[in-house]
Structures are given as C-alpha cells and as structure tokens.
C-alpha cells in the first residue's frame, strides 16, 4: 500500500460516503472553468492522494456499497475532485481488476476523455461491464472557453468508438447549442449505445471565478426554457433537477420521489415527539418551497432556507449543506428540535469541514435529528 493512514482515512471516507474510488490527486490541467479546485479552499481539509497501488484498490473495494450496481474509479466529490482517472499509469489495469472483482456491477470512469489513449479502445471495448461516463460539456463554439484543453478531435473519436455508459451535456445558456449537441449525439447514434444522455445545469458559489459566474447565471436564467424544449423534443434525455418545481418533472424523477419519501419520514418523526415540541426543518434552496408547502398546515413546524455558500453544484433534495452556512443564516426564535438532511454528514458523521453534529446541538442548545 502507498497510502498512509491519513490518506487512507480520506480515501475510505470518499468511497463509503459517495461511492467514488479516488485513485490519485494529480491536477489534470485541463482547466475546466467550473472546476472547484480554483476557489473552494475547504478542499484543503482533505489530504492529497498519491497514485494508489493494487493493494490500496483492493482494500478500497471493501468500502463500496453492496446495494448499488456500479463502481466508479477516478475523481471524488471531496477527495481528489480535480483529477482525471486516465492520468493514473495503472488505470487500464485497475479497470480490468475492478471488472473481474465486481462482475455483476458496472465499472465506470468519469472523464472529459482528454487522456484516454485511442490505442486502448479495443481493450476497453472487450470489458463487458465497463463504460465511460463522458463529460462532453458541449461540442459547440463555447467548448474551448469552458474547457481550455478540450481535445475536440479525441472527444469525437470517443463518441464514435468508445464504450460509453453515460454522456453528459452542460447547458451553457444557449438553447441552440443544446439542440446542436443533441442532434450530433443522435446522428452518431450515441443514444443507442449509452445508458443515459444527461443535460445538467451549471452552478456557482459566491467565491467562484467571474467567468464561471457569468456562464452559470446565463445557464440558470434559461434552464427552465431549455428543459421544456428537451422534454418535448428528446423525451428520453435525462436532466438534473436543481429545484423541485413541476417544470422539472419527467427527467430525474427520483428527486421528487425522494422528496415525498423524506417528507413522509419527517412527518413520522414529528408525530413521535412530545406534544408542543417546536421543530425547525433545515432546507436547502433546491427543496425549500416544496417542503414549505408540504408542512404548511403544521403550526409547530417551520421550514428554514439555508443557502449553500460553501459548496456549489449540489442538486439533491437534501443538498450538501454544512454547519458554517447554518450558523451564519439560521437564528431561530424558538428551537426545540432541528431536523437536518442526513446527507450533510459523511460516513464518519462529520460535515464538510469535519464537524460532528453534536457541535451544532451545543451551539443551538437543541436536539438534532437526521432525516
């Protein structure tokens, strides 16, 4: 093993929490404008991961979720979020090892494709349970502005010949570009070879670089229009749901299903509390209005909007909130019990900045329930 204890703890946490196996921390150098490494200083909280070896990989397999049907090799959410798996000198060996270790699971690598070797296509295509999650972004005029080292020709080669599991487009705020990208993918019959074509929204935080803020705001302003067109013209294309609004039904409907199930669980929790207990629900922007309507008839329950200033890009119902943002924005008049999203905490029970929920309970002198 090459990982020391601190590195292995971070490695283990990323796998067990998010399902990603981070195999190295080398900065990819592609320069994507939306890369978090440029602005998110909290990522320094986690140690860098040297290129792992076979023993590290096999040990990491022990922390994968047995209930999911995939294994992702490469970058993580918090650990090594700015790399490309194909920078690892043993990546092709690792793909083969993972495919044989998990013969019933899909082995995937999330990548822009910039470092994939074309002479390895036959090898990759020979592995029946492997597929690339290709972050295509866009193939239109803005590509080089968003991905300075875009490797356009290599990307086109991958679209034609690589084993693809998923192809992700990033809406840039220009509907014509999405139309052209989807036309291209269907012309190449990528839609027949992938499990999913995904259209997603760009996100930013207060600390993001100006170019990203400009791109992201243009995307946010016109995302509803984009999705309305996609649903009508390409009903099989999936899209991310940044806010629980009816216009976004029909894409990743699991967001709405998860929200309704979460609301039911929260109602059960609230009904089990002593009469008169005042409950504050901590809600991210994505679900605040939806949850507010759901609890409107309960006078002992208040929904509280917490904007995500620390970490951008989360579109889940719970969001990836953190203690820092909660303390800065949540100042209740009454607070017996707080219900916070369980997704705030990693497998070790710590938030993004390494704080346990007991610290928040002490700060607010209130009981915290995950739900």
Regions inferred by a protein language model and the residue ranges of each:
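Canonical Radical SAM [4Fe-4S] cluster-binding loop centered on the CxxxCxxC motif
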Residues: 5-56
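Well-ordered, non-membrane alpha-helical segments in soluble/globular domains
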Residues: 50-60, 87-96, 148-157, 178-186, ...
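Short amphipathic alpha-helices and their capping/turn segments at secondary-structure boundaries
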Residues: 53-65, 115-127, 156, 182-193, ...
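Radical SAM enzyme core and accessory elements
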Residues: 1-11, 250-371
């Amino acid at each position: 093993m090459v990982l020391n204890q601190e590195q292995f703890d971070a490695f283990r946490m990323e796998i067990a929490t998010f399902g990603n196996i981070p195999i190295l921390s080398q900065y990819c150098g592609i320069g994507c404008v939306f890369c978090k490494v440029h602005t998110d200083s909290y990522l320094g909280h986690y140690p860098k991961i040297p290129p792992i070896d076979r023993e590290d990989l096999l040990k990491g397999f022990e922390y994968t979720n047995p209930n999911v049907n995939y294994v992702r090799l490469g970058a993580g959410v918090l650990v090594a979020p700015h790399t490309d798996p194909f920078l690892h000198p043993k990546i092709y060996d690792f793909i083969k090892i993972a495919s044989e270790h998990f013969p019933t699971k899909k082995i995937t690598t999330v990548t822009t494709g910039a470092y994939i070797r074309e002479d390895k296509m036959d090898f990759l295509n020979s592995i029946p349970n492997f597929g690339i999650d290709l972050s295509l972004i866009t193939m239109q005029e803005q590509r080089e502005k968003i991905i300075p080292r875009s490797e356009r020709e290599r990307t086109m080669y991958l679209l034609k010949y690589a084993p693809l599991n998923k192809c992700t487009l990033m809406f840039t705020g220009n509907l014509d570009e999405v139309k052209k990208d989807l036309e291209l993918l269907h012309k190449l019959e990528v839609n027949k070879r992938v499990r999913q074509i995904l259209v997603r929204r760009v996100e930013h935080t207060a600390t993001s670089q100006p170019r990203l803020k400009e791109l992201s705001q243009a995307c946010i302003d016109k995302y509803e229009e984009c999705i309305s067109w996609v649903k009508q013209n390409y009903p099989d294309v999936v899209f991310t749901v940044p806010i629980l609004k009816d216009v976004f039904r029909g894409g990743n409907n699991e967001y709405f299903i998860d929200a309704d199930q979460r609301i039911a669980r929260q109602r059960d929790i609230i009904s089990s509390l002593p009469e008169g207990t005042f409950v504050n629900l901590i809600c991210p922007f994505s679900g605040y209005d939806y949850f507010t309507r759901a609890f409107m008839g309960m006078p002992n329950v208040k929904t509280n909007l917490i904007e995500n200033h620390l970490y951008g890009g989360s579109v889940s119902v719970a969001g990836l909130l953190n203690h820092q943002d909660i303390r800065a924005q949540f100042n209740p008049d009454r607070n017996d019990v707080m219900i916070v999203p369980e997704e705030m905490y990693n497998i070790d029970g710590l938030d993004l900045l390494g704080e346990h929920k007991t610290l928040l309970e002490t700060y607010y002198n209130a009981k915290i329930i995950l739900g």
